[in-house]
């Protein structure tokens, strides 16, 4: 047998397999010798032996097969043996890993223990070092004391009358007296010593000395160190204010208290050692610390002294007086400051105080620069600053009773967040007061004299009286600023800027001649605006909620007010040569300012209601940049004025005299009556209005200006002599603006304008269009100005424009009931996106037809006669009767109206109607023969009968909300803005109220 049954080392587990292998070996003539010989040998030797047998040709084939089966059995045995060895190795490795883990845990615990020991040793080392340093410090202190005592003994020899001890060499106490010089010297040296080296004075002048052995006893013998029965450490305050003395039992004591007491210094710390001086309770100083905790008065600093102080005291009654050439710096967080320092000429006291109460501010003379950063809650009296002083105050005070009076050539800068300011500073000539205040109440503003520039940045809630600024001054209000790097010095004819966020303004500033007050206020109430004299430019950017009376500004003034006020009852009256500018977002404006000759009122208001607009005299220019919700009456502006208005509603537009340029950029919702502009004026209606009831009538030489939101303008305007190009546009790119001759003002509000019109003399092309492309603009002849870019929802009556005028209607109109009649020499501009035009218009000499229409069907286009340029941009759905335009006129039909019932009759002219209408029943553009006149009259009668029908049968009209003045579609039963329901009335129609 090759293998034995039951041998687990063979690798075989089944007896059948072992029996089959043994039978094969025996059948082939083999023997168990090969298996037994290589049983314990490795597999390499078994394989080498098998190869030798197989390769030998002399060995029979049967023997080869028997050896092969034996080698197979040996291979299985080798594999089983290797598996056992591998299992043993794995077990050993697992044990080794466990041992390593245990070792690591032990090492970790040892490491933690060593770390704790290291920390303890380090702590002990630090404590030892601290103790050593303390010992060294004590040693140095003792050495210093010893040296001081020896030096004092060398300087002042000891008295010769002393009593020796009972035995030779025995030390005993000796009492003696000190003269006045010795006492003063000792006191002086004691005051110069450190705090830790102070020695407590004794009630009697008793000193202990060793008995002298030679003539030189001063500092040669060691002192007798006696132990006190009650040792007191250093820096220990005496409970009763009495100095502590160490009673020593001397053998012999000579006391002379009666003679010594008058010679004691009044106060002081005496040198260390065993010296003990006599002093009374009234004459002794505090025994431990000489730091004062209360100071009744400031020290007087003389000329050329720099006194820095950091006072955080709770009460400071009297301020320091700093003479000329001083710079006192105080950083005080005191709660109450009753009297501030008075600083003479040439000083600069910067005070950075966050005090809660400031009753009197410093009076600073000439060439001083006071700097104050105060967050005080109450300021009763502000500093009076003389000539050439620059007071700079950054105060967040809540109450300001009296503001500083600043003299000539001063620049006061105040950054105050005070809540109440009762009286503002009065600043004389050539002063620049700058105030950055967030005060809540301002009762009286500063009075600033000639050539002053007060600058105030106030977020005050209440302003009762604004500053009165004299000639040449300029109050500037820079508010809500966190830092002010450089403050300008502005001389005569300056521009004061004011930005105040006050909630209540009762009386505004009165600014004299050559002043420029500028106020940017977000106040909630303003009762009276400033009165500014000649050559002043008051600029107010106020977002106040209530403005009862606006400033009255004299000649040559430019009042600018940017207000977001909710109510404005009376606007300023500005005299000749003034330019009032109002940039207001007010909700209610009852009376606008009256501006005299050569004035330019500019207002940018988002007010909700404007009852009466300013009346501007000759040579003025009122500009109303307003986003108001309702404007009842627009200012009447005389000759050479430019009113600009951006309002949400305009009930009555201004009447502008000769040579005026009224500019109105308005997003008003309703316009009941448009301005009547005389000769030489230019009314510009930059409006995105929802309803326009009456469009202005503009006479000869008028310049309408348009506020454009155009995205591209390729060619810029060339404006000849006497023109005023005003581009108040929100354009993304400006490539080329039109070339406009003399006395023209081009204003375009278009998205793209590839080529602008060439307009002759006395023309002003203004385009306020959001059109996407305009490839070629009109060529307008002399004396005309065509501008009708309108997005109006309803237009009840269109203006009648005389000769040489320029009518501008920027509206998106849904219904156009009555078209305008335009006389001779007018140029209508049409921006229409028409889909189909079967027959183009025939335009005679000197005509520029521009038709860009979105109309669905246009069967026959108009025939336009001489000197007529009809431009229609209409998206109307139905056009029943078209207008007849006389010679030299231009029909402007830039409307996206839904219905157009009846147009006006325009003789001798054929208008260009570019409409998005579904059907055209009657076209007046045809030259009808006499046989068709009867049909034409019948159609007129039918249209008149349809026009006389009740409102229920007519097309729906947009309705305006009475609360928010928002325009709504007829299908809307609820206001889209304020969400209020419209109510029906008795006559069958619908009343929005």
Curated annotation (Swiss-Prot):
Residues 281-381, 520-547, 894-959 are annotated as: Disordered. Residues 353-364 have a biased composition (Basic and acidic residues). GO terms for molecular function: mRNA binding; zinc ion binding. InterPro entries: TEX13A-D_N, TEX13A/C/D_Znf, TX13C/D_rpt, Znf_RanBP2. The keyword Ligase does not apply. A zinc finger (RanBP2-type) spans 955-984. It comes from the Eukaryota. It holds the Pfam family TX13_rpt. Residues 325-335, 944-957 have a biased composition (Polar residues). Keywords: Metal-binding, Zinc, Zinc-finger. PANTHER family: TESTIS-EXPRESSED PROTEIN 13C-RELATED, ZINC FINGER PROTEIN. Belongs to the TEX13 family. This is Testis-expressed protein 13C. It comes from Homo sapiens (Human).
């Amino acid at each position: 047998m090759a293998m034995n049954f039951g041998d687990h080392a063979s690798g075989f587990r089944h007896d059948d397999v072992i029996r089959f292998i043994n039978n094969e070996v025996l059948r082939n003539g083999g023997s168990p010798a090969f298996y037994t010989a290589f049983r314990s040998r490795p597999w390499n030797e078994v394989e080498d032996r098998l190869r030798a047998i197989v390769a030998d040709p002399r060995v029979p084939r049967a023997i080869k097969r028997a050896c092969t089966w034996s080698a197979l059995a040996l291979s299985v045995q080798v594999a089983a043996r290797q598996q056992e060895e591998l299992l043993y190795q794995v077990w050993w490795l697992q044990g080794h890993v466990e041992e390593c883990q245990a070792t690591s845990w032990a090492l970790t615990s040892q490491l933690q223990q060593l770390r704790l020991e290291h920390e303890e040793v380090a702590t002990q080392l630090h404590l030892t070092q601290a103790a050593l340093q303390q010992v060294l410090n004590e040693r140095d202190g003792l050495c210093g004391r010893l040296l001081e005592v020896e030096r004092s003994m060398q300087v002042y020899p000891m008295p010769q009358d002393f009593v020796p001890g009972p035995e030779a060499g025995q030390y005993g106490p000796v009492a003696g007296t000190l003269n006045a010089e010795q006492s003063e010297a000792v006191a002086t040296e004691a005051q110069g010593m450190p705090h830790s080296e102070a020695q407590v004075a004794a009630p009697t002048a008793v000193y202990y000395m060793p008995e002298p052995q030679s003539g030189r006893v001063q500092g040669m013998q060691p002192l007798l160190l006696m132990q006190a029965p009650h040792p007191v450490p250093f820096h220990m305050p005496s409970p009763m204010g009495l100095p502590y003395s160490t009673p020593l039992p001397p053998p012999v004591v000579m006391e002379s208290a009666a003679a010594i007491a008058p010679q004691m210094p009044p106060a002081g710390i005496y040198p260390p050692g065993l010296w003990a001086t006599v002093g009374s309770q009234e004459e002794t100083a505090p025994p431990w610390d000489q730091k004062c905790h209360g100071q009744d008065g400031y020290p007087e600093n003389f000329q050329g002294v720099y006194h820095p102080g950091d006072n955080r005291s709770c009460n400071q009654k009297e301020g320091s007086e700093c003479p000329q050439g001083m710079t006192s710096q105080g950083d005080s967080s005191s709660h109450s400051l009753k009297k501030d320092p008075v600083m003479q000429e040439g000083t600069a006291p910067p005070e950075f105080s966050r005090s809660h109460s400031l009753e009197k501010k410093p009076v600073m003379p000439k060439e001083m620069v006071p700097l104050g950063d105060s967050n005080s809650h109450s300021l009763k009296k502000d500093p009076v600053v003389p000539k050439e002083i620059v007071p700079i105050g950054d105060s967040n005070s809540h109450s300001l009773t009296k503001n500083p009076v600043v003299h000539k050539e001063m620049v006061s800068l105040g950054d105050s967040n005070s809540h109440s300011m009762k009286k503002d500073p009065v600043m004389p000539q050539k002063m620049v007061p700058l105030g950055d205040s967030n005060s809540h109440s301002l009762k009286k503003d500063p009075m600033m004299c000639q050539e002053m520039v007060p600058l105030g940045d106030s977020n005050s809630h209440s302003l009762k009286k604004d500053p009165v600024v004299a000639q040449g001054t300029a109050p500037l209000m820079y508010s809500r600023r966190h830092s002010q790097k450089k403050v300008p010095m502005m001389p005569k004819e300056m521009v004061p800027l004011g930005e105040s966020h006050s909630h209540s303004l009762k009386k505004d500033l009165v600014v004299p001649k050559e002043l420029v007050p500028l106020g940017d206020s977000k106040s909630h109430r303003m009762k009276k605006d400033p009165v500014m004299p000649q050559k002043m430019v008051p600029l107010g950017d106020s977002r106040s909620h209530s403005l009862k009376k606006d400033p009255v500004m004299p000649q040559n003034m430019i009042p600018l007010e940017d207000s977001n006020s909710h109510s404005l009852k009376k606007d300023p009256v500005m005299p000749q040569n003034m330019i009032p500018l109002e940039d207001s977002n007010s909700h209610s404006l009852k009376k606008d300012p009256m501006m005299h000759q050569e004035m330019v009122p500019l207002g940018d208001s988002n007010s909700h209601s404007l009852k009466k607009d300013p009346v501007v005299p000759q040579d003025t220019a009122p500009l109303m940049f307003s986003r108001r919700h309702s404007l009842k009456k627009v200012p009447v502006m005389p000759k050479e004025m430019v009113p600009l208005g951006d309002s949400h509603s305009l009930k009555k537009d201004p009447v502008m005299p000769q040579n005026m340029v009224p500019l109105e950029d308005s997003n008003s919702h309703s316009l009941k009556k448009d301005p009547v502009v005389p000769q030489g004026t230019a009314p510009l209606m930059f409006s995105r209005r929802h309803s326009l009831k009456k469009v202005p009538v503009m006479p000869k030489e008028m310049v309408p200006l348009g506020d454009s939101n155009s995205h591209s303008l390729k060619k810029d305007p060339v404006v000849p002599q006497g023109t005023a190009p005003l581009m108040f546009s929100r354009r993304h790119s400006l490539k080329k603006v039109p070339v406009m001759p003399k006395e023209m003002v081009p204003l375009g509000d278009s998205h793209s304008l590839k080529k602008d019109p060439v307009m002759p003399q006395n023309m002003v092309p203004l385009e306020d269009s959001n059109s996407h492309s305009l490839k070629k603009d009109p060529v307008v002849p002399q004396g005309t100005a065509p501008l009708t870019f309108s997005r109006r929802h309803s237009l009840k009556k269109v203006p009648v424009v005389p000769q040489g005028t320029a009518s501008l209607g920027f509206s998106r109109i849904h219904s156009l009931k009555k078209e305008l009649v335009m006389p001779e020499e007018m140029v209508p501009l049409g921006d229409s996106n028409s889909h189909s035009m079967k027959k183009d218009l025939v335009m005679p000499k000197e005509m520029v037809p521009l038709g860009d229409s979105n109309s669905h069907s246009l069967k026959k286009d108009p025939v336009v006669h001489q000197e007529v340029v009809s431009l229609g941009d209409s998206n109307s759905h139905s056009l029943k009767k078209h207008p007849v335009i006389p010679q030299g006129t231009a029909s402007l039909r830039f409307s996206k109206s839904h219905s157009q019932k009846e147009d006006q009759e325009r003789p001798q002219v054929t208008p260009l109607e570019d409409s998005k209408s579904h059907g055209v029943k009657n076209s007046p553009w045809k030259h009808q023969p006499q046989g068709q006149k009867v049909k034409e009259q019948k159609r007129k009668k039918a249209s008149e009968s349809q026009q006389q029908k009740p409102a229920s049968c007519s097309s729906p009209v947009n309705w305006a909300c009475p609360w928010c003045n928002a325009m709504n579609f007829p299908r809307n039963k609820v206001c889209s803005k304020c969400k209020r329901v419209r109510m029906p009335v008795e006559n069958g129609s619908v009343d929005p109220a």
